From Swiss-Prot:
One example GO MF annotation: nickel cation binding
Function: Transcriptional regulator.
InterPro entries associated with the record: Acetolactate_synth/TF_NikR_C, ACT-like_dom_sf, Arc_rbn_hlx_hlx, CopG, CopG/NikR_regulator, Ni_resp_reg_NikR, Ribbon_hlx_hlx, TF_NikR_Ni-bd_C
Protein name: Putative nickel-responsive regulator 2
Entry's family note: Belongs to the transcriptional regulatory CopG/NikR family.
Keywords, sorted A to Z: DNA-binding, Metal-binding, Nickel, Transcription, Transcription regulation
Positions in coiled-coil regions: none
Native species: Methanothermobacter thermautotrophicus (strain ATCC 29096 / DSM 1053 / JCM 10044 / NBRC 100330 / Delta H)
CDD domains named in the record: RHH_NikR_HicB-like
A Pfam family assignment: NikR_C
Amino acid sequence: MMRISMSLPKKLLNEFDEVLRDRGYQSRSKGIRDALKDYIVRYQWMNEMEGERIGIIAVIYDHHYTGVMEDLADIQHDYREYINAVMHVHMTERHCLEVIVVKGDVAKIRELTEKMMRLKGVEHVRLTSTSTEQKIEHEH
C-alpha cells in the first residue's frame, strides 16, 4: 500500500471522523479508501451513461464566495438548451442549493455537471438521471 499525505479543512475532517464513528470504522485510512472507491464508482457510472437522459443536477455552493453565483449563471446560460428548469433554495446564511432539471444528450449534461464541479465555492454537485427511453408502467 502507498502512504500519502493530504491537507483538509478541520471542519471537513471532523465531519468525516464523525461519519466513520457512526459507521463503526476502526481506521480512518479504511474510511478514506472506501470514500475514494465510491468517488471512482460514481465517476465511472457517470462516464458510462449514453444517449438521451433526463434528470437533475443538485448543486450546493457558498454564495459568499466571490463570483460563484455569476460563474454558475454563465455556465447555465451556455447550456440553456439542456436545462428545463432551475430551483434555488436558501439553505443557510451562507449556503444555497440549486436543483437544475436537465434533458438531452448525456455528453453535454456530463460536461455541464463537470464544469460546475470545478468552480471554487461549489461544495457539492450530484447528477441523477435516467434514460428518456425507459418505459414506466402504470397500474390502473
